[in-house]
């Protein structure tokens, strides 16, 4: 029994060491980006070719998206992750995450993607009022998100039931 407890403690300690604390937030955000891709609905014309997620300003989120989620299916499409240098030249970007380190560029991206079905996700206070559709918040040590449902619908993106339930109301 004692040997089993020591083994469990060693495994738990080993797992804790494989995911650095500073990457935990990036891992959670990447998982949310994948869930947003899976549980929202885009117009039929955006359901051909790869499902593209762009990441601007956060190499940790980008690396995690590439290693864990690239090439996973989103409906009948395969998920493709692109970086900032490809975002404005891609034929279509379904989900765009803009990190707070690039918040000065939000206006440029909202102008570029106006009238296009691109879900814009951010992580700083006040971003919804500046054109973001979903914004990550840290509440009592947990990563949560708020959303602008009207903005999503105006971009022809239908929020899924799970996304609506998970969002802060």
Please name every model-derived segment.
Residues 1-2, 169:
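Absolute protein N-terminus
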Residues 13-169:
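Short hydrophobic alpha-helices and adjacent helix-cap/hinge residues
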Residues 2-10:
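Bacterial N-terminal signal peptides
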């Amino acid at each position: 029994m004692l040997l089993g407890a020591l083994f469990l403690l060693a495994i738990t300690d080993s797992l804790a060491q494989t995911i650095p604390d500073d990457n935990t937030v990036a891992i959670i955000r990447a998982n949310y980006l994948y869930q947003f891709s899976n549980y929202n609905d885009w117009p039929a014309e955006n359901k051909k070719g790869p499902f593209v997620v762009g990441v601007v300003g956060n190499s940790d989120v980008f690396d995690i998206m590439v290693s864990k989620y690239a090439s996973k299916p989103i409906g009948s499409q395969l998920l493709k992750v692109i970086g900032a240098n490809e975002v404005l030249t891609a034929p279509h970007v379904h989900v765009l995450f803009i990190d707070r380190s690039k918040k000065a560029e939000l206006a440029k991206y909202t102008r570029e993607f106006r009238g296009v079905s691109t879900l814009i996700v951010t992580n700083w206070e006040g971003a919804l009022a500046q054109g973001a559709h979903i914004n990550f918040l840290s509440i009592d040590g947990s990563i949560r998100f708020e959303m602008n449902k009207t903005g999503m619908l105006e971009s022809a993106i239908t929020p899924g039931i799970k996304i609506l339930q998970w969002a802060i109301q």
